[in-house]
């Protein structure tokens, strides 16, 4: 409204690179001026971004600090600092000891892996009495998969105390599993989520803490950056 730009949002039914590529291909065909994407797999999107660039379309990403073939990537904050902070919060809540596991939406998601790398590094440096029980777990940004993977974790690691999520779907999925297994107070879900999604689980104690930024602000900034670049600034 401020600029007169016709900005709109589209999304796929499933969170996967192939769906994102198809959407970008469609936007290229429509000859839009700029495309802004939160990539599931930055490497997989490089060819289609190059195609967009070759067509004269500006390309931007959010949450993809290693993305190539784009005009700019826009980050909300320092991803390492964010990951370390989330570990600090979980560690304090667990009294600096116990077993935990980390989830990512996709193993190819840049920011999710940057957060988890920082979480694990912080734990190893600061909290030696905590233990990561398994490699990071992919839940495909799907709450049902997060729920099922959490049930598997709880069966495999009966001493598990914390589950750290990166995708917004992890906390509610993990918290539901914790609630159903009667483990509130013994196991907690932590990580990136929004109050509108996690409220009930924060209230009943299955989720212990969440961390977030304002997605609307990220969208606003991305649009304004695109607008300024289109004007030649």
Task: Describe the role of every protein-language-model region.
Residues 1-233:
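A residue-level marker of the well-folded mature domains of exported/periplasmic proteins
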């Amino acid at each position: 409204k401020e600029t007169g730009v016709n900005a709109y949002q589209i999304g796929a039914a499933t969170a996967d690179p192939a769906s994102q590529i198809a959407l970008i291909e469609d936007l290229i065909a429509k000859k839009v001026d700029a495309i802004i994407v939160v990539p599931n797999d930055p490497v997989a999107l490089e060819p289609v971004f190059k195609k967009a660039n070759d067509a004269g379309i500006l390309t931007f990403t959010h949450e993809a600090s290693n993305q190539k073939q784009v005009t700019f990537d826009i980050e909300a904050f320092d991803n390492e600092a964010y990951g370390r902070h989330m570990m600090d919060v979980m560690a304090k809540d667990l009294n600096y000891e116990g077993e935990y596991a980390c989830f990512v939406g996709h193993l190819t998601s840049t920011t999710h892996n940057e957060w988890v790398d920082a979480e694990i590094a912080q734990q190893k440096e600061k909290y030696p009495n905590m233990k990561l029980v398994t490699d990071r777990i992919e839940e495909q940004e799907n709450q049902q998969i997060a729920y099922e993977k959490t049930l598997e974790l709880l069966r495999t690691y009966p001493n598990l105390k914390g589950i750290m999520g990166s995708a917004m779907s992890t906390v509610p999925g993990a918290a539901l599993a914790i609630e159903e297994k009667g483990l509130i107070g013994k196991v907690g879900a932590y990580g990136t989520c929004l109050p509108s999604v996690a409220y009930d689980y924060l209230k009943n104690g299955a989720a212990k803490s969440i961390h977030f930024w304002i997605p609307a602000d990220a969208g606003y900034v991305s649009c304004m950056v695109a607008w300024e670049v289109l004007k030649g600034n």
